């Protein structure tokens, strides 16, 4: 039974780097957009959902660093940035909203590789633990 649980945990850990990379890729793509469009808002909502999924997956995998909380915050902030962009009536308000969005997206680009690395470290530690257990 413990072996099955450990296997499920490591499978989850092996998927985390791909999810972190997806969050990073989405953040980079959204950063390049310069106009408020329905596609931008939908992209931000997708990014927010993926950041929230990454947060939950990190938490479920037992990553004890602040990363689950950080990605939860990024997901919440992304939704707020989408609302801010939709409410912006003037060029100045739009410029401010885009600046705020880009700051958030830049943070995601910088932090997503840390999430992938933390998951890889945990997967390696889990594999070593299983190897030791099998030898005993």
Named regions from a protein language model:
Residues 85-99:
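Amphipathic, charged alpha-helical scaffolds that flank and support histidine-based chemistry
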């Amino acid at each position: 039974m413990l072996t099955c649980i450990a296997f499920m945990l490591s499978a989850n850990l092996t998927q985390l780097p791909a999810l972190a990379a997806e969050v990073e890729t989405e953040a980079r793509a959204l950063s390049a957009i310069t106009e408020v469009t329905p596609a931008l808002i939908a992209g931000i909502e997708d990014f927010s959902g993926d950041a929230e999924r990454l947060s939950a997956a990190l938490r479920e995998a037992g990553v004890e660093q602040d990363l689950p909380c950080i990605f939860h915050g990024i997901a919440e902030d992304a939704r707020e940035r989408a609302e801010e962009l939709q409410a912006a009536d003037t060029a100045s308000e739009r410029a401010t909203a885009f600046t705020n969005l880009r700051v958030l997206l830049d943070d995601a680009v910088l932090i997503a590789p840390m999430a992938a690395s933390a998951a890889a470290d945990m997967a390696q530690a889990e594999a070593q633990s299983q190897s030791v257990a099998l030898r005993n």
